[in-house]
Structures are given as structure tokens and as C-alpha cells.
């Protein structure tokens, strides 16, 4: 491993290149700070690359397919009602790539240094960034941690094989499952459930009654009513 000989100075270091991280980086640069943004995976974070945006693409496709199924009721022939998952996956990748390029261009326009690597604190005002065989050291005035979150696997899930999916990888499936069990009740879980149901899966939603409700009681009741109608 090659260790940088010079400790580099920055006003602001941001660890995490998701919406929180790159938005803070842009604002810091606009205020005249020297900013370095560190992301160990793809710029845009989980939201853009594996979570929110892929979920919205699938939800949009599902809503369009649901519209087609009702055209016959209006006397409109819908032709061959087929669904091509590979085309949807290609479209999803195009959307993600375009949005990621937009974030990259925003960072360039604001003169933000973007480093792909893993950051480790060496002192209260110093970090090391590992990128392959390179290890660079930075001292900073301020640091923002925007590392995001990751799904928590329920304790009762003991078999973590290929059939157990997370919100981070379900939108990369190469075929629509015949039966899908969704555990959770936040908006991502409900988007997964509704989109895969519209695309052909038989979907069952599971959640703990004891867990805190994500939505207001009236919204929860309305969602429950709508999902029951779609059985």
C-alpha cells in the first residue's frame, strides 16, 4: 500500500456521497470552503443507486401496467399485454446512470473533490482514505458524517440464502418471483409490495403489530383497505 507523504488540509470533509452528503458538499463549496467528499461505492448513495430511485422506476412501471389492464373496460384494445423485465432493468440502469452523472457534474461545477474510498478516523481532526493500494491522509476543520443506513435483518431469519432479499438488491432480480413475502411497513416495503404485485407476483406483507406505526392511523387504515381490495 502506498501512503501519501503529505497530509492534505481541507476546510470540510464529508463522508458519504448520498443525498445528504453531496447536498452538504455543494452548500459548503458555495460558502467558499475547500470540500472533499468521500464515498466508498457509487456517488449518489444507496438512495439513488439501489433504493429510492429503483423503487420509483418499478412503481412507475407497475402503475402503467395497471392502467393497461383497465383499458378494455373503456373499449380500448391494449394489444399484446406482455411484460419484459430485462427492458425495465435496462431502463432503470439508464435512469440511475443519468442521475448519477448529474450529481457528478454538480460536484465538478462546484469544484468539490470527490474520492472513492473508505475513510477511517486517525484522530479527532484527521482521517485516512483507503482507495485500492493508495492511502491518503487529510486534516480537516469540520467533518460531516452522512454514511446513511442499512437494513436490519430480523432475528428470526436464520437462512440468509439467495431467496432472502433486501431493499438494496430486490430491484436487480432477473425474473419476477411467483410469490413474494415483504417484511416491513415503511414506504419502501409498500412500494415493493405494490409494484411486484402489479407485475405478477402474489405478495404477502408481514409486519410486527408491536412495532411503531410508520404512518398516521387514518393513512394506515386507508392503505390497509386499498391493499385488501387488490387481493
Model regions: which residues?
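Glycine-rich flavin
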Residues: 2-10, 26-33, 38-176, 209-213, ...
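Beta1/beta-strand and adjacent pyrophosphate-binding region of the FAD-binding site
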Residues: 6-18, 176-186
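N-terminal Rossmann-like FAD-binding beta1-loop-alpha1 element of flavoenzymes
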Residues: 11-37, 190-198
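A generic structural signal for ordered secondary structure
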Residues: 13, 128, 202-204
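Residue-level detector of alpha-helix initiation sites
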Residues: 18-22, 42-43, 151, 171, ...
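Rossmann-like NAD(P)H-binding beta-loop-alpha module
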Residues: 163, 174-210, 214-215
Amino acid at each position: 500500500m502506498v501512503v501519501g507523504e503529505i497530509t492534505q488540509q481541507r476546510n470540510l470533509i464529508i463522508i458519504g456521497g448520498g443525498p445528504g452528503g453531496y447536498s452538504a458538499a455543494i452548500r459548503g463549496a458555495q460558502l467558499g470552503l475547500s470540500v472533499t467528499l468521500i464515498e466508498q461505492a457509487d456517488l449518489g448513495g444507496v438512495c439513488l443507486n439501489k433504493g429510492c430511485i429503483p423503487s420509483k422506476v418499478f412503481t412507475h412501471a407497475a402503475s402503467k401496467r395497471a392502467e393497461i389492464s383497465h383499458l378494455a373496460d373503456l373499449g380500448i384494445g391494449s394489444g399484446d399485454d406482455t411484460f419484459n423485465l430485462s427492458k425495465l432493468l435496462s431502463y432503470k440502469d439508464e435512469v440511475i446512470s443519468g442521475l448519477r452523472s448529474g450529481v457528478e457534474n454538480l460536484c465538478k461545477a462546484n469544484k468539490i473533490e470527490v474520492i472513492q474510498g473508505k475513510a477511517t478516523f486517525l484522530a479527532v481532526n484527521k482521517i485516512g482514505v483507503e482507495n485500492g493500494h493508495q492511502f491518503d491522509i487529510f486534516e480537516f476543520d469540520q467533518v460531516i458524517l452522512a454514511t446513511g443506513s442499512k437494513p436490519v435483518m430480523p432475528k428470526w431469519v436464520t437462512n440468509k440464502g439467495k431467496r432472502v432479499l433486501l431493499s438494496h438488491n430486490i430491484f436487480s432480480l432477473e425474473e419476477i418471483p411467483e410469490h413474494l413475502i415483504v417484511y416491513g411497513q415503511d414506504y419502501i416495503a409498500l412500494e415493493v409490495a405494490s409494484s411486484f404485485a402489479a407485475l405478477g407476483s402474489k405478495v404477502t406483507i408481514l409486519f410486527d403489530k408491536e412495532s411503531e406505526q410508520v404512518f398516521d392511523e387514518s393513512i394506515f387504515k386507508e392503505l390497509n383497505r386499498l391493499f385488501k381490495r387488490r387481493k
